[in-house]
Structure formats: structure tokens, C-alpha cells
């Protein structure tokens, strides 16, 4: 999805602009040649934001014709990352926070498209906010004009959902003839090209488990803050997590299927595994 379309989607979602205006000439994150002092208008060090998605089949999660949300992660410009950046803003009551903010529609959507494939949804949402959301510097409480407690939590979750809605991976793959099948296999280049078509031609990261496609990461640089700023698609900063060919794309509820355990995130660049 293009940058203008993302901006229109933000307006359509009814976002309340509670952040100070950012300078028009501020650079995109990770694209600056000199240091940028305005920490509320420039995402740093986590200047590469990733909208990440799961395809869980055993047990299945979410609708059979849709990928599901993993999260929104602020990676550093070199592909490294921070985690659990503010213990004082770690929460264990995401559902209650959203209800208090009147975000019932968001909560309903999350229950359908942001499930924990094996466990409690609330625990999953808490983990994503506590580990990743607290590391986005442009949504810290001091960046709001009129801050109310936990406002940034609801904004983070809403932004994650908004980005996900603009990245329909299932339809993008299907349009290219790539559909879930118990026996058919695909080339990595075919999958990457199909997904790049909804990401301004920029290649996402794809991951496989036991030869089966199970995760996608879409990368962005941001101009302005992470909620109201302009999102610019960029190519993946991480090496592919699937082989070049013979990739399975299994139907949900398949007996010979794989599950993307949300607790783990593979860093293919360093061949390490990290809690996610």
C-alpha cells in the first residue's frame, strides 16, 4: 500500500491527532544524514517498523482466508532491535485498557484477527505491547499534547490493525495463483513478488517452518511519529527464512501443518532465536 493510501486510511479510522506538528522537512527514519533532535517526530533508534503476520495451521487461528496479526515492531536501521524498553509502562490489562478508552470495535477486531494460536489472546497482546510497543520512542507519554494514562497503548494497537488491514497477504498471494494446498509447492521468488505488489514493490521477509510458509514481515521507514506519520515501504532488512523453492502453503486445519509459535521470533541474519 502506498504512503498516501496509508494516510487516508489513518484519517478514515478516525484517529485523534493529539501529537504536536512535526517539521515538514524532517527526514524519514533511517534515511537521515545528520542527527535529528526531535525525539517525538523521529523514530530512533527503532527506525524500521515491521508489521508482522502469521499463518497458523495446526492448530489453526483466525479465518481460513486470512493471515493474522503478529505485531508492530520497531527494529533498528541495521536490523537489530531493542526490547522491553520501559518497565513502568508494561501492562497486564490490555482488554480493560481498550474498554476504558471506548475502543470496543478495535477489541472485537483483535479477537478475530490477532489471536494467540495456542493460549490466551490477552497474554499475546500484553507481550507485544510490553516488548515492542514500549520501544517506539515517538509515542512516549511526553509526546502527547494532552496525555491520558495508557493512551499510547490503544494508539499502538490501533495502528497495528490499520497497517494490517492495508496488507491483505491472503488476497495478494491468491491473485498470483498462490493458494493454500496440501500438496502443491511454490518458489520463494513467486511469493515475494506477489506480496511486494501490495507493498509498493518492496520485498517483505518471509519465514518457513518445516518447509511451510508461516510468517511475513513488512518493513517501513517513517516520517513523523509512529501514529500519525507517513509510512514508506522498504525492502526487508532480514535474509529470507524460506528455501528458494519447494515451499508449502498449507491450508488451515491440515493434519500435516505447522504452527507459528508466537513466543519465538527467528533472526535469520544471525541464525539465533529470540522470544517474540
From Swiss-Prot:
Active site (catalytic residues): 70, 128, 132
Disulfide bond sites: 22-41, 30-77, 40-143, 85-135, 208-242
Listed InterPro entries: Ribonuclease_T2_eukaryotic (IPR033697), RNase_T2-like (IPR001568), RNase_T2-like_sf (IPR036430), RNase_T2_His_AS_1 (IPR018188), RNase_T2_His_AS_2 (IPR033130)
Keywords for this protein: Disulfide bond, Endonuclease, Glycoprotein, Hydrolase, Lyase, Nuclease, Signal
GO annotation (BP), single: RNA catabolic process
Keyword Signal: yes
Entry-linked CDD domains: RNase_T2_euk
Cleaved signal peptide residues: 1-17
This protein's record includes keyword Protein biosynthesis: no
Gene Ontology cellular-component terms listed: extracellular region
Residues carrying sugar: 32, 93, 256
Enzyme Commission numbers on file: 4.6.1.19
Enzyme class, spelled out: lyase
Catalytic activity: a ribonucleotidyl-ribonucleotide-RNA + H2O = a 3'-end 3'-phospho-ribonucleotide-RNA + a 5'-end dephospho-ribonucleoside-RNA + H(+)
Top-rank taxon, per record: Eukaryota
GO MF annotations in UniProt: ribonuclease T2 activity; RNA binding
Family classification: Belongs to the RNase T2 family.
Miscellaneous information on this protein: Preference for adenylic acid.
Name of the protein in question: Ribonuclease T2
Species the sequence originates in: Aspergillus oryzae (strain ATCC 42149 / RIB 40) (Yellow koji mold)
